[in-house]
UniProtKB/Swiss-Prot annotation:
Pfam families tied to this protein: EF_TS
Designated name of the protein: Elongation factor Ts
Native species: Tolumonas auensis (strain DSM 9187 / NBRC 110442 / TA 4)
InterPro entries with a match to the protein in the record: EF-Ts_dimer_sf, Transl_elong_EFTs/EF1B, Transl_elong_EFTs/EF1B_dimer, Transl_elong_Ts_CS, UBA-like_sf
Stretch forming the signal peptide: none
KW Cytoplasm (keyword) present: yes
Principal subcellular localization: cytoplasm
A molecular function (GO) term: translation elongation factor activity
PANTHER family: ELONGATION FACTOR TS (PTHR11741), ELONGATION FACTOR TS, MITOCHONDRIAL (PTHR11741:SF0)
């Protein structure tokens, strides 16, 4: 039996909005597996708002650049929001993006070992900034996209999107990049949703219907309609267009004679846990480090 810690209970509460004792019980029954606990709580109706992506805690910036038919997007992490807003930190990230774009470097290790333009590698230059500011930093991920109709969109330096279209125009590609940033679709089209994702959601929805008092055969019929809505909700082309919710993205694309080949969405700190720190102490620590 896994040890159920206060931190695990706290995370489950934040991700489900359920009570402390319910979370502790769910974790115990799931042997400490948070994702399984969320799934079980959804089935029983306890989870009010299970957040699919989990908590986003790490700090940093997303940078995107494009030229012609090539676009690049990267994530540069740091420990605090204080440093994420630092001009030298941002300048380094922008220069790295320009280097990657110029040479179409999609391999992170190759990029880290590429000359920064100062006689030292990207990683050594980053290490020098770490020593200067006194906070750990990491060039976490990078992606290169190529196509005839590409667009990039950055929202508040924390969310970045590249869209790749066939047909349409630059404005449409940019609008859809903005849509992806705002609505976080997981797939391009409903038919792209994996069988595993569909099966898991179907099981959850059937259990919810049965627990509400419906016979199993009726519950299964009810779920068919819910599943169509589910696959549409998590797919770009099935969502209402962010700039005009009366239009579904699939219909917008048809009107414009365009198709979405792919999209890539980065959000700062996805999947990274960050130790909680007192903000005032965090600021004082950064000021002291800079003075030192």
């Amino acid at each position: 039996m896994a040890d159920i810690t206060a931190a695990m209970v706290k995370e489950l509460r934040e991700r489900t909005a359920a009570g402390m004792m319910d979370c502790k019980k769910a974790l115990t029954e799931a042997n400490g597996d948070i994702e399984l606990a969320i799934e079980n709580m959804r089935k029983s109706g306890q989870a009010k708002a299970a957040k699919k992506a989990g908590r986003i805690a790490a700090e940093g910036i997303i940078i995107a650049r494009s030229a012609g038919n090539v676009a690049v997007m990267l994530e540069l992490n740091c420990e605090t929001d204080f440093v994420a807003k630092d001009a030298s930190f941002r300048a380094l990230g922008e220069k790295v993006a320009e280097i990657a774009l110029a040479d179409k470097i999609a391999d992170l290790e190759v990029l880290k070992n590429t000359d920064f333009g100062n006689g030292e590698s990207v990683q050594v230059t980053l290490n020098n900034l770490i020593a200067k500011i006194g906070e750990n930093m990491n060039l976490r991920r990078i992606v290169i996209a190529e196509g005839d109709n590409l667009a990039t969109y950055i929202h508040g330096s924390r969310i970045g999107v590249i869209t790749k279209l066939v047909g349409g125009d630059a404005d449409l590609a940019k609008d859809l990049a903005m849509h992806v940033a705002a609505n976080s679709p997981q797939f391009v089209k409903p038919e792209d949703v994996s069988a595993e994702v569909v099966a898991k959601e179907r099981e959850i929805q059937v259990d919810i219907a049965i627990n509400s008092g419906k016979p199993k055969e009726i519950a299964e019929k009810m779920v068919e309609g819910r599943m169509k809505k589910f696959t549409g909700d998590i797919s770009l082309t099935g969502q209402p267009f962010v700039k005009d919710p009366s239009v579904i993205v699939a219909d917008l694309l048809k009107q414009k004679g365009a198709d979405v080949q792919d999209f890539i969405r980065f959000e700062v700190g996805e999947g990274i846990e960050k130790q909680e720190t007192d903000f005032a102490a965090e600021v004082q620590a950064q000021i002291a480090a800079m003075k030192g």
